[in-house]
């Protein structure tokens, strides 16, 4: 067939839709109740006898320029490939993969876009039955869409994540029909879709044709209101095409049954219901049966829930309780399919959210597949449903074009904004999970948002409206005050009333916080303590759920990010910022969230008494098994199960009658383990300290024998010796014929060498700029002297290092003193003194050594079993752990410092023949080990860049900076930074035992 393809609509600002049907609720019709009952909410769109599913194989032609399409496209003479939908061009090899954060992919001249855009043409032939009405539905197409049927134009749509529907009754027929979908890469609407993600195009969600009779259901509304006596009234409206002798029967899961006719409206009063919440996701399956006489001619299912949302001054109340939204921001992203996530993919995410103790999700930054919200209804998640609006490119460089309010304060765009908000609302209006509507993200303000806000309050005044961007505009806030990455200090000021008038009088919500990029986020527990400190604080949503990355198991780099695909414009690895890896394996950040979001919290009160607090608002703890393990010096000594139930939002004192708890001479910990009684799944484990003592001072025996000859210092002890080269440091450490040190260290540094830098964390981003200015990132420890001295009444070998950058500048000086006794025990004291005035913010101070690579097995007494830092440790209780050097680091997509174990009192690394043990002296240390050096880590952009050079690189740090969330959020607070100054040198000591 021949088609005259529309060539100007995507650039015509006056047109963002043509012939598109008004937005309505998502549902799937069936011909009968019997057909409906064969399916569930996930399978219904694929199995309904009223649906012709178009997803699957299409003919596909990709044109890199619109001008390359013939004036009249003849599908019979067009060369087509085969493409499977849902999919995107970028993930199927047609267009360049590109990750962009805040920028537009074209020059900013709103509303104008490059006219000659890339276009994808999809063709499919389908057989349709005879019926009275046909509607073609696209659940998601990026960017703009024009639809044709049998050579005729059906309509046009913008708004990638909103449903687009067209009535094709008049241009379709019984039998074979040709469907053509033309997708334009960009349109005027692209100015409203500048979200932080890989920019992709294509039919990325399901599309299908609905076939209906003369009488059909088009839309419905279920709106409940709570009465003073705690019953609910339910208003029901059904719209569609209804002839005489038709009626609607509504059956609500044993709750009620009613029949409508004529106006198709009714009100059911004083229903006694089980309320919906994330803790108690009580949904009622509703069957809507359209009848002609006594015969059902159409059947529809939906789900309803009953909730009451109110704002009382500064307090957000859900079913009369001041809930805490412990949430995440969720993008549609898949490691191979990009935007084209399946319902199984979405359900996996929902299940993981619940497993990791989330109770809320923000659909950043667009409406999701409608079934995602059904899953939120059923599994129990408070949803912040966000409109497909973001104009972040007007915040971005170059600064001469910085104008964040550019579109939002231009009322010419108001109809474009409103269309997206209205379509979100109409599609999702019946979901009990929708706790707030969101007007979009990072688009400035406020005139276009005002129009959208007024619309939402006119149709759904019960549900609060959220928009973070208002905080930087004249509006300040709509129904709640929202911030991104507000610091704990800001929250404390809000509590004190000193943060400013804009933070008063409304609930406070952190729509994004704890930026989870790479290693971290740190500080999550501090946020939790603040959330629970005031009813004004609603909680927040961590940024973000999962890493965005492109996976190819056969490529040089299996996981790629911005810049890896030769794209001219990109924003690097800023997309790799999730709690979960792209394959949904949890990072240590996800483990931290799981513990911090736990529903029960314990506190030791002394005298064997503990307080257990149930942080849930609606349910007691009868579904949770609470057990405990008492450990002494990291090893379990006693355990038990508590027979107790804690009421919602309540605390209860319990007593554990164990004499161990009274022992103040040892480390005594109580680990509380919370499990789901029904499934046995661990909800969380938290550790409470009953007693914690400082490490004892390690005492050495008699001095070893020290001898010097030329450039060599030899220290001799029982069955071994240590050899120092005065120009190289400790070059050999041998006992019982075992050499502990690597003979030719990869970083060309011998012995226990001081360091002050780390493989930069993504969350070090703000500080890295400063560190690079002063040259900290390229500084090297240069050995200045190595000699025998008397110190603290003993002989030692003192090595002095200067940290030199750019060949001449000295940032700091370090002394590393080695004390030996006659048994071969070695005490090391490391001291760092300031030279450069700018080095008051260090990432770490410690020493490292390259051991013989046969040292692989690790045992330690400290925090574990996975990496942890001072502000990132709730997931890592103190204990005795065994692991291997190979398993110590985490394999982040962008390599960075990882694998640190904090609060360590003792650690050992062993081979088949020997063991080296590190003992804390007065204060615990940080311990790490891996098979690559700091230099190799710092140079790597991908994990594949790190060579396997057969070394065991061991670090004993006295001081390690926290992680914070400074890739976008706050840096670690002062107590998790390293305090270093001219009058505050850094010093610590540890002991090494060879055996």
Give the role of each language-model region.
Residues 91-93, 140, 185, 277, ...:
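Beta-strand/loop-rich accessory regions of lumenal/periplasmic or secreted enzymes
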Residues 91-96, 103-112, 158-160, 168, ...:
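An acidic-aromatic loop/edge-strand motif
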Residues 3-17, 21, 44-45, 59-63, ...:
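Accessory beta-strand-rich segments of carbohydrate-active enzymes
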Residues 173-176, 239-310, 668-672, 676-702:
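Extended acidic/polar, glycine-enriched regions
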Residues 2-46, 100, 191, 295-611, ...:
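Extended substrate-binding grooves/exosites of carbohydrate-active enzymes
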Residues 196-216, 556-604, 608-610, 615-623, ...:
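Catalytic cores of secreted or luminal carbohydrate-active enzymes
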Residues 258-271, 634-664:
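Intrinsically disordered, low-complexity Pro/Gly/Ser/Thr-rich segments with frequent PxxP/GP/PP motifs
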Residues 240-246, 617-624, 837-841:
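A short beta-turn/strand-edge loop motif at beta-sheet boundaries
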